[in-house]
Amino acid sequence: MLVGDWDVYFARGSTALPGFEGWRRMGFAHFAGPDSSLTGSIRRRTGEPILVVTHVVARRDSVRLSGDGNLTIDAAWRGDTLAGTMLADGKPAGQRIRLVRRTTPFVAEQPYALWPGAVSDSQYAVTEDTLVFMRTRDGARLASYIARPVGNGPFGVVLQRTPYTRILHTAGHYWASRGYIFVAQHVRGRDVSDGTVFGDYDTDVRDGYDAVEWAARLPNANGRVGMIGHSDEGRLAWYAAVSAPPHLAAIAPSAATGDPWRIVPYEDMVFSPINVAWACLMRARTLQDISELDIGAALAHLPLTDLPQRLGCGDVPLWNRWIAHPTLDTYWRAHAVTTKIARVKAPVLQISGWYDDSRGPIDYTNALSAVRGHPFIRLVMGPGAHKGIDYVAGEFGAQSRVETRRLQLRWFDRYLMGKDNGVDRELPVDVFVFGDNIWRKEAAWPLARTTPVKWYLASGGRANTSAGDGVLDTIAPSGSAADTFSYDPANPTPFLIDSRELETSLNEDFTALNASRHDALVFTSKLLTKPIEVTGQMSAALWAASDARDTDWIVMLLDVFPDGHAERVQDGIARARFRLGFDREAVLVSGNVERYDIDLWFTSRVFEPGHRIRVSVSSALFPKYDRNLNTGGNNERDSTFVVAHQRLVHDPAHPSHVVLPVIPR
């Protein structure tokens, strides 16, 4: 009965957060063979294995699945669905699981040759030095791992500066076997490197400069250095690039974090408390175990300043520093890359995913594209989340998964080894288009043929939940009705995320929340009769009033499928106190209608015929964003809150709407 393909849903066993335990589609499963010798695996949607099944005990009404590790699944049949719990070492792991049979199989996960040109082959034997110290200009010693090709060279150098304490043997062998010297360097305060981790911006910039120039002088190096790095490592690559070291020949970061007031730890100066997981992970010289942290329950309590202590992480200086700067002040401006990006002289390849929870690559592309005379820049935006476009399950089609290192290798073959492989003459933008599930090359970002289309919010005053009368249309509203709801910080509208994951997942199903939460207004279009492609930056403009001194306005864009399930496309937030600018705070006047402009990030998606476009408006998405306590005080340090009574206006004088970048088809 298990043979075939399954969707896998998870839910946490218990939580103090209302709605936080909602079922989430987290992965897929495939089984083959008779029950007596069945094989298969359960994988996350990113493609990572959760359980490789090696043993099955099948009874008439239940199944036990186990593998080589410590995980076991006990499940009972409910019709054609399996429902049960996960066990770790025979004990409940606090997570429930459902397997729902798919009607169509997943596509086999083979990397797609997005850039089909030739790349350097794996041909060299490899030697490793697991601990080499580099001395910075101020005398600090930074621990480095070096993998070298066996040969005389000269070789290009691939440098990865990292705050993560791991020896990158796999990466080292990949690059060195292909004719590159690979260097992974621990930043200050990590592993056995001197100093304090996450120090000031200037130190990271200087260390990046020094590391590039040191790497360029390594034996058998050709003097050309390229930098890679994922997530925070990508930030470090950008920090080095803005210092313009003479021997930095190219960078190719993936999912690089952006300016910190824009994303991580704040999003447009709204704090994201789920980053406590990362702060606890990084609180010491080595990566800390956070697998047992009950972050969901801890988040239910106030104030946020005490969150690391409630989790048993102790004092976390990085967390304290984040909390200490709640406005766009000189601290955050100093850490920004976009304002210094004209200093970057090296060619840039950026790789990320539409569901990455970092907007850095798009922000950097926009800023760098405005610099006259900058060397070549390429942007690759795929279907993945923060872990990368390498880890995408097959549900987006045969072209969905791309090998990041192969793109970086072709980039460095050109700029570090001088091979005329044509990568600098190709169209500079690659986007994966959801719906069509194809990659497409473009001449520029944003797309020149974009037509901004306004979709207006309207109702008869009862838009609460998806059963209400909220309408989304390209025709401006003619009526004068407004919609109201109450926002209670004790029961915030939830965002579907397991906070033990360090990222948002791919396309969350918000169907149940749209139907049940009366503190969210829902506006849905008519059935689409033709495809509508939306590729680019999205935004919203709301006219709204509150009786609170401060509050939040959140807009989410969703794709409603013919079967009724609603998948999140993107969302964005405006904190009322920052409506005049992120560097100043202005409390509200009770009942005054104000305009809020909200950044909805970006996507590339075809809303297909038979689908509907949906917009929801709420005042919380917790714990993605911290709860606004509605008092006008400090939302991170305070514990008292009030209920806010909200009014969204959508009349001819106040035409609340979203703007979608439509691509003619």
Language-model features, listed with the residues they occupy:
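Glycine-rich nucleophile elbow surrounding the catalytic serine of serine-hydrolase chemistry
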Residues: G229-Y239
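Central antiparallel beta-sheet cores of small beta-barrel/beta-sandwich binding domains
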Residues: L2-R78, T85-M86, A93
